[in-house]
Amino acid sequence: MATDTPPQLAGPPTPAMETLDRDVVMSPRKRRRLSASAEPELTEPESDGTSGGRGAAAEAPETAALEPKSLFNSTSTESSITSSSTTTTTTSSSSSIAPFLAKHIRDQHASRNRFAPADSSLPRRKADSKYCYRHRPDLKCRRQADEPTVDQMQRDLSTLSQNDQQSIAHFWSLFSAAPSKHRNLMLQGIVAQCCFPQLSFLSASVRDLIRIDFVTALPPEISFKILSYLDTASLCNAAQVSRNWRHLADDDVVWHRMCEQHIDRKCEKCGWGLPMLDRKRLKDTKRQVQLRAAGKEAVTGRQQQQHRPWKAVYMDRFKVGTNWKYGRCTTTIFRGHTNGVMCLQFDDNILATGSYDATIKIWDIETGKEIRTLRGHESTIRCLQFDDTKLISGSLDRTIKVWSWRSGECISTYTGHQGGVLCLHFDSTTLASGSKDNTIKIWNFQDKSTQILRGHTDWVNAVKLDTASRTVFSASDDLTVRIWDLDTGKCIHTYAGHVGQVQQVLPLPREFEFKHTSHCDDDRSDRLSGSESPDHRASHDSNHAPDLPTTSAPPTQPMSPLFEALFNEDRPAPPRYMLTAALDSTLRLWEVHTGRCLRTFFGHIEGVWGLAADTLRLVSGAQDHMTKVWDPRTGTCERTFTGHRGPVTCVSLSDSRMATGSEDCEVRMYSFKA
């Protein structure tokens, strides 16, 4: 009795195998034509008398059992490959599959190859030398399938016959062992033979699988860099993805950058700007943020609790900025003066006001109650300024007084002006004052010296010191604004353009940014040129008021050569931009170093008396009883506040508050805090 020979693992391909190879890439129509013309003949393997072929075939299904939890696991793949290669039922499948598996298993898993011993003399390549991060075997290529998917596949597989189970297991083993190029070719062949429902199934299955969690895969520094490009809404959405994403999206490194982009400036991307809360904290924690971005611990836990998270800072500033934008605020009215309020200033929880009734009142902002009244001047209080220790006031009685506002004591009195004192401004070492006598007086706190700046031909209504550049700005009833050198006492430049008495001048913070256009918005005739009319050219030391045209403003003078000569690397230049307000009902934005009027703000119907500004907005108060909030970059009026029953004579501004004083004897405080 003849016995069947065991299947051979190597040999020439049979007609059946050739037909199967053609069928992989053959269209269904061509396959039907070929099968009708030539039916392949299956030959029974020869017997060598050692074992029965049918018995080996019968054992194959039992030895090809699929391990459900390791369908795509490299270890289970190798065991499946070994089992499959030894239990193949036909010579054709054995002769084609086994060499393929042996070759590619040796290439990809040389250290655990069961087909041939590893050659220790060959240099081992790095695991990621041939693969991108998506296909690196040590990362993603041999990823474990999720439990529900594997269980469902096992249940579906168990419903098939043993031969079908073995065939599918062989196909999985073949695909698992194939390199990237072969896998792509196999997938192309499969996709080419799929019908539309099968393609739809593929699309739905792959949609979620191709998503990569880059936050987990990348180093924290790179993840921080990517997240820092998101806007606020996107960052909040990212924090909802997972715990790991939330941990990174809420980190101080990301929100510190967000605060830098928006707080105290306008973001170029979204157009939002948020008010500055505390500049000191930004400097103190800069080093800590850099260390955290580098993956290092910046501070101890106890120290870290002393600082608010930057996300909380942003949230607070965002709420305040939104309140400014939509005009949501609470109003507190301070009543106590018996005559019109002419000047005011507030800081933290203290408000100081000066009035026609010759008194200065100190108020508690939170309670709205008067703390004390400073008495000593004999006439109207036109100007005041205070810091932590002292308050300085100027009056129409021609004197300047220094007070201890906490105790109410008058420390000293300065005299020297020949007319009423209309304005003052001081820093740590210097006091500047302007008067009805058309002069500016500079008082030195340290050496008690004084200096007089002459050049204006009418009352000096406003002065502002710039400590860094050692300059002072002044505005006058002679329709001009001047900038002076404190070291020499000379006028550096005169700015002309208003057709009404200039009441206020305000240098903007150096952080203020303005997008320039090719020409001035309004006074195109005021642009600097080398050929000004001699009729409108005035000397810096002229003692006569310029001739005023009836239909247009006098042109600005060319920039003085002194400007470029004075300010260089050793001496900082003055702020680049300044604002002015005048009784011609307009405000103007100027470029200081060129003398150009960049923008004119129209909206008030009577003269403007009060002016305050920061990097985000400016506030003006006018004879028309109205207070307006403007965007300095666009020139648009964002909001108008009414309520005063008299002209608004003075205004003051902070990040979350605005105060206005009026001739109706009232002070109104608007709070935009969240």
Curated annotation (Swiss-Prot):
Keywords attached to this entry: Repeat, Transcription, Transcription regulation, Ubl conjugation pathway, WD repeat
Composition bias, Low complexity: 56-96
PROSITE patterns reported in the protein's UniProt record: FBOX, WD_REPEATS_1, WD_REPEATS_2, WD_REPEATS_REGION
Annotated SUPFAM superfamilies: F-box domain, Quinoprotein alcohol dehydrogenase-like
A Pfam match: WD40
Keyword Repeat: yes
Residue ranges of WD repeats: 336-375, 377-415, 416-453, 455-496, 557-600, 603-640, 643-674
Domain of life: Eukaryota
Keyword Repeat found: yes
Pathway as given in its UniProt record: Protein modification; protein ubiquitination
Any single biological process term in GO: protein ubiquitination
Basic and acidic residues: compositionally biased ranges: 518-544
Domain F-box positions: 212-258
Ranges for region Disordered: 1-96, 518-561
InterPro entries recorded: F-box-like_dom_sf, F-box_dom, G-protein_beta_WD-40_rep, Quinoprotein_ADH-like_sf, SCF_subunit_WD-repeat, WD40/YVTN_repeat-like_dom_sf, WD40_repeat_CS, WD40_rpt
Task performed by this protein: Component of the SCF(sconB) E3 ubiquitin ligase complex involved in the regulation of sulfur metabolite repression, probably by mediating the inactivation or degradation of the metR transcription factor.
Family: Belongs to the WD repeat MET30/SCONB/SCON-2 family.
PANTHER family the UniProt entry points to: UBIQUITIN LIGASE SPECIFICITY FACTOR/HREP PROTEIN, UBIQUITIN-BINDING SDF UBIQUITIN LIGASE COMPLEX SUBUNIT
Subunit-level organization: Component of the SCF(sconB) E3 ubiquitin ligase complex.
Protein name: Probable E3 ubiquitin ligase complex SCF subunit sconB
